[in-house]
Protein backbone atom coordinates (compact mmCIF):
# COMPACT_ATOMS: atom_id res chain seq x y z
CA UNK A 1 0.00 0.00 0.00
CA UNK A 2 1.23 3.48 -0.90
CA UNK A 3 0.27 6.93 0.33
CA UNK A 4 0.26 9.98 -1.95
CA UNK A 5 -0.24 13.33 -0.22
CA UNK A 6 -1.01 16.56 -2.06
CA UNK A 7 -0.28 19.68 -0.03
CA UNK A 8 -2.45 22.78 -0.03
CA UNK A 9 -4.81 24.90 2.03
CA UNK A 10 -8.42 23.82 2.60
CA UNK A 11 -10.52 26.95 2.13
CA UNK A 12 -12.17 27.71 -1.22
CA UNK A 13 -10.31 31.02 -1.45
CA UNK A 14 -7.11 29.01 -2.02
CA UNK A 15 -8.42 27.09 -5.03
CA UNK A 16 -6.31 27.93 -8.06
CA UNK A 17 -3.40 29.33 -6.05
CA UNK A 18 0.20 28.33 -6.60
CA UNK A 19 0.46 26.93 -3.07
CA UNK A 20 -2.42 24.52 -3.79
CA UNK A 21 -0.88 22.83 -6.82
CA UNK A 22 -0.36 19.73 -4.64
CA UNK A 23 -4.13 19.49 -4.18
CA UNK A 24 -4.63 19.94 -7.93
CA UNK A 25 -2.15 17.15 -8.64
CA UNK A 26 -3.82 14.57 -6.39
CA UNK A 27 -7.27 15.59 -7.62
CA UNK A 28 -6.03 14.84 -11.15
CA UNK A 29 -4.77 11.40 -10.08
CA UNK A 30 -8.01 10.52 -8.28
CA UNK A 31 -10.17 11.76 -11.16
CA UNK A 32 -8.25 9.63 -13.66
CA UNK A 33 -9.39 6.57 -11.68
CA UNK A 34 -12.93 7.84 -11.13
CA UNK A 35 -12.24 8.15 -7.39
CA UNK A 36 -13.82 10.81 -5.19
CA UNK A 37 -12.49 12.38 -2.02
CA UNK A 38 -14.33 11.85 1.25
CA UNK A 39 -13.57 12.30 4.96
CA UNK A 40 -10.32 10.55 5.76
CA UNK A 41 -8.43 9.56 8.87
CA UNK A 42 -7.49 12.54 10.99
CA UNK A 43 -7.94 15.92 9.39
CA UNK A 44 -7.84 15.00 5.72
CA UNK A 45 -9.88 14.11 2.69
CA UNK A 46 -8.95 10.83 1.05
CA UNK A 47 -9.53 8.85 -2.11
CA UNK A 48 -8.60 5.22 -2.67
CA UNK A 49 -7.43 3.74 -5.95
CA UNK A 50 -5.83 0.55 -7.16
CA UNK A 51 -3.06 0.98 -9.71
CA UNK A 52 -1.68 -2.19 -11.32
CA UNK A 53 -2.65 -4.18 -8.25
CA UNK A 54 -1.17 -1.68 -5.77
CA UNK A 55 -3.57 -0.06 -3.30
CA UNK A 56 -2.98 3.69 -3.11
CA UNK A 57 -4.41 6.07 -0.53
CA UNK A 58 -4.47 9.68 -1.74
CA UNK A 59 -4.96 12.43 0.83
CA UNK A 60 -5.43 16.17 0.97
CA UNK A 61 -4.64 17.45 4.49
CA UNK A 62 -7.32 19.82 5.76
CA UNK A 63 -4.99 21.27 8.39
CA UNK A 64 -3.56 24.13 6.33
CA UNK A 65 -0.16 23.81 4.75
CA UNK A 66 1.90 24.54 7.86
CA UNK A 67 0.33 21.67 9.85
CA UNK A 68 0.27 19.01 7.12
CA UNK A 69 2.32 16.56 9.18
CA UNK A 70 -0.63 15.80 11.45
CA UNK A 71 -2.71 14.41 8.56
CA UNK A 72 0.24 12.49 7.12
CA UNK A 73 1.03 10.80 10.44
CA UNK A 74 -2.66 9.96 11.04
CA UNK A 75 -2.95 8.27 7.63
CA UNK A 76 0.38 6.45 8.02
CA UNK A 77 -0.62 5.15 11.45
CA UNK A 78 -4.11 4.07 10.44
CA UNK A 79 -3.03 2.29 7.26
CA UNK A 80 0.32 1.14 8.70
CA UNK A 81 2.29 2.76 5.89
CA UNK A 82 6.05 3.22 6.29
CA UNK A 83 8.01 6.31 5.18
CA UNK A 84 9.41 4.55 2.10
CA UNK A 85 5.86 4.17 0.80
CA UNK A 86 4.78 7.81 0.93
CA UNK A 87 5.07 10.52 -1.70
CA UNK A 88 4.40 14.17 -0.88
CA UNK A 89 3.42 16.47 -3.77
CA UNK A 90 3.87 20.21 -3.25
CA UNK A 91 4.75 23.53 -4.85
CA UNK A 92 8.34 24.74 -5.01
CA UNK A 93 9.18 28.42 -5.40
CA UNK A 94 12.84 27.53 -6.05
CA UNK A 95 12.03 25.57 -9.22
CA UNK A 96 11.06 27.28 -12.46
CA UNK A 97 7.52 26.84 -13.66
CA UNK A 98 7.44 23.92 -16.07
CA UNK A 99 9.70 21.72 -13.93
CA UNK A 100 8.99 18.84 -11.60
CA UNK A 101 11.59 17.37 -9.30
CA UNK A 102 11.39 14.08 -7.44
CA UNK A 103 13.67 13.33 -4.50
CA UNK A 104 13.97 10.34 -2.20
CA UNK A 105 14.75 12.56 0.79
CA UNK A 106 15.97 16.03 1.67
CA UNK A 107 15.32 19.23 3.51
CA UNK A 108 12.14 21.28 3.40
CA UNK A 109 13.81 23.83 1.14
CA UNK A 110 11.67 26.61 2.58
CA UNK A 111 8.38 24.75 1.99
CA UNK A 112 6.48 24.94 5.29
CA UNK A 113 4.26 21.93 4.60
CA UNK A 114 7.35 19.77 4.08
CA UNK A 115 8.93 21.34 7.15
CA UNK A 116 6.01 20.26 9.34
CA UNK A 117 5.98 16.76 7.85
CA UNK A 118 9.71 16.42 8.58
CA UNK A 119 9.10 17.58 12.17
CA UNK A 120 6.13 15.23 12.58
CA UNK A 121 7.95 12.19 11.18
CA UNK A 122 11.27 13.05 12.81
CA UNK A 123 12.97 12.39 9.49
CA UNK A 124 13.70 13.89 6.08
CA UNK A 125 13.69 10.42 4.54
CA UNK A 126 10.49 10.30 2.51
CA UNK A 127 9.86 10.86 -1.19
CA UNK A 128 8.62 14.16 -2.49
CA UNK A 129 7.57 15.51 -5.86
CA UNK A 130 8.00 19.25 -6.16
CA UNK A 131 6.22 21.26 -8.82
CA UNK A 132 8.02 24.44 -9.87
CA UNK A 133 5.99 27.64 -9.60
CA UNK A 134 8.68 30.32 -10.12
CA UNK A 135 7.83 32.33 -13.23
CA UNK A 136 10.95 34.46 -13.63
CA UNK A 137 14.21 35.43 -12.02
CA UNK A 138 13.01 38.72 -10.56
CA UNK A 139 13.16 39.03 -6.81
CA UNK A 140 9.85 38.84 -5.01
CA UNK A 141 8.92 41.37 -2.38
CA UNK A 142 6.49 38.96 -0.70
CA UNK A 143 6.88 35.21 -1.00
CA UNK A 144 3.58 34.55 0.77
CA UNK A 145 1.64 36.87 -1.55
CA UNK A 146 3.16 35.11 -4.55
CA UNK A 147 2.52 31.51 -3.44
CA UNK A 148 -0.98 32.37 -2.22
CA UNK A 149 -1.72 34.21 -5.46
CA UNK A 150 -3.72 32.73 -8.32
CA UNK A 151 -2.02 31.43 -11.44
CA UNK A 152 -1.92 33.81 -14.40
CA UNK A 153 -3.42 32.60 -17.69
CA UNK A 154 0.07 31.77 -19.00
CA UNK A 155 0.91 29.87 -15.81
CA UNK A 156 -2.36 27.92 -16.09
CA UNK A 157 -1.29 26.69 -19.53
CA UNK A 158 2.01 25.44 -18.08
CA UNK A 159 0.27 23.77 -15.12
CA UNK A 160 -2.17 22.00 -17.46
CA UNK A 161 0.87 20.45 -19.15
CA UNK A 162 2.53 19.56 -15.85
CA UNK A 163 -0.38 17.92 -14.04
CA UNK A 164 -0.72 14.83 -16.29
CA UNK A 165 3.06 14.31 -16.12
CA UNK A 166 2.98 14.77 -12.35
CA UNK A 167 0.24 12.14 -12.19
CA UNK A 168 2.31 9.73 -14.30
CA UNK A 169 5.37 10.33 -12.11
CA UNK A 170 3.41 9.71 -8.90
CA UNK A 171 1.89 6.52 -10.28
CA UNK A 172 5.34 5.38 -11.46
CA UNK A 173 6.51 5.83 -7.85
CA UNK A 174 3.71 3.58 -6.57
CA UNK A 175 4.78 0.68 -8.79
CA UNK A 176 8.50 1.13 -9.46
CA UNK A 177 9.75 3.24 -6.54
CA UNK A 178 11.32 6.66 -6.22
CA UNK A 179 14.60 5.93 -8.03
CA UNK A 180 12.78 4.79 -11.17
CA UNK A 181 10.43 7.77 -11.07
CA UNK A 182 13.36 10.17 -10.57
CA UNK A 183 15.20 8.72 -13.56
CA UNK A 184 12.15 9.07 -15.79
CA UNK A 185 10.64 12.39 -14.70
CA UNK A 186 13.34 14.75 -13.36
CA UNK A 187 13.49 17.03 -16.39
CA UNK A 188 11.85 20.23 -17.61
CA UNK A 189 8.31 19.65 -18.80
CA UNK A 190 7.79 22.69 -21.05
Swiss-Prot record:
<feature type="binding site">
    <location>
        <position position="64"/>
    </location>
    <ligand>
        <name>tRNA</name>
    </ligand>
</feature>
<feature type="site" description="Discriminates between blocked and unblocked aminoacyl-tRNA">
    <location>
        <position position="9"/>
    </location>
</feature>
<dbReference type="GO" id="GO:0005737">
    <property type="term" value="C:cytoplasm"/>
</dbReference>
<dbReference type="GO" id="GO:0000049">
    <property type="term" value="F:tRNA binding"/>
</dbReference>
<keyword id="KW-0378">Hydrolase</keyword>
<dbReference type="GO" id="GO:0072344">
    <property type="term" value="P:rescue of stalled ribosome"/>
</dbReference>
<feature type="active site" description="Proton acceptor">
    <location>
        <position position="19"/>
    </location>
</feature>
<feature type="binding site">
    <location>
        <position position="112"/>
    </location>
    <ligand>
        <name>tRNA</name>
    </ligand>
</feature>
<dbReference type="GO" id="GO:0006515">
    <property type="term" value="P:protein quality control for misfolded or incompletely synthesized proteins"/>
</dbReference>
<comment type="subunit">
    <text>Monomer.</text>
</comment>
<feature type="site" description="Stabilizes the basic form of H active site to accept a proton">
    <location>
        <position position="91"/>
    </location>
</feature>
<keyword id="KW-0694">RNA-binding</keyword>
<dbReference type="Pfam" id="PF01195">
    <property type="entry name" value="Pept_tRNA_hydro"/>
</dbReference>
<dbReference type="GO" id="GO:0004045">
    <property type="term" value="F:peptidyl-tRNA hydrolase activity"/>
</dbReference>
<keyword id="KW-0963">Cytoplasm</keyword>
<dbReference type="InterPro" id="IPR018171">
    <property type="entry name" value="Pept_tRNA_hydro_CS"/>
</dbReference>
<comment type="similarity">
    <text>Belongs to the PTH family.</text>
</comment>
<dbReference type="InterPro" id="IPR036416">
    <property type="entry name" value="Pept_tRNA_hydro_sf"/>
</dbReference>
<comment type="function">
    <text>Catalyzes the release of premature peptidyl moieties from peptidyl-tRNA molecules trapped in stalled 50S ribosomal subunits, and thus maintains levels of free tRNAs and 50S ribosomes.</text>
</comment>
<dbReference type="InterPro" id="IPR001328">
    <property type="entry name" value="Pept_tRNA_hydro"/>
</dbReference>
<feature type="binding site">
    <location>
        <position position="66"/>
    </location>
    <ligand>
        <name>tRNA</name>
    </ligand>
</feature>
<feature type="binding site">
    <location>
        <position position="14"/>
    </location>
    <ligand>
        <name>tRNA</name>
    </ligand>
</feature>
<keyword id="KW-0820">tRNA-binding</keyword>
<comment type="function">
    <text>Hydrolyzes ribosome-free peptidyl-tRNAs (with 1 or more amino acids incorporated), which drop off the ribosome during protein synthesis, or as a result of ribosome stalling.</text>
</comment>
<protein>
    <recommendedName>
        <fullName>Peptidyl-tRNA hydrolase</fullName>
        <ecNumber>3.1.1.29</ecNumber>
    </recommendedName>
</protein>
Amino acid sequence: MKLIVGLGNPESRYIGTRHNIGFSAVEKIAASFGANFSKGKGKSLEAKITHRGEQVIIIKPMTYMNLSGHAVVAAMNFYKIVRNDILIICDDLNLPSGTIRLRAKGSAGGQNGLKHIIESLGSEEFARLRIGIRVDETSLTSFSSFVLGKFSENEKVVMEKILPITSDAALDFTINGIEHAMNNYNKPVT
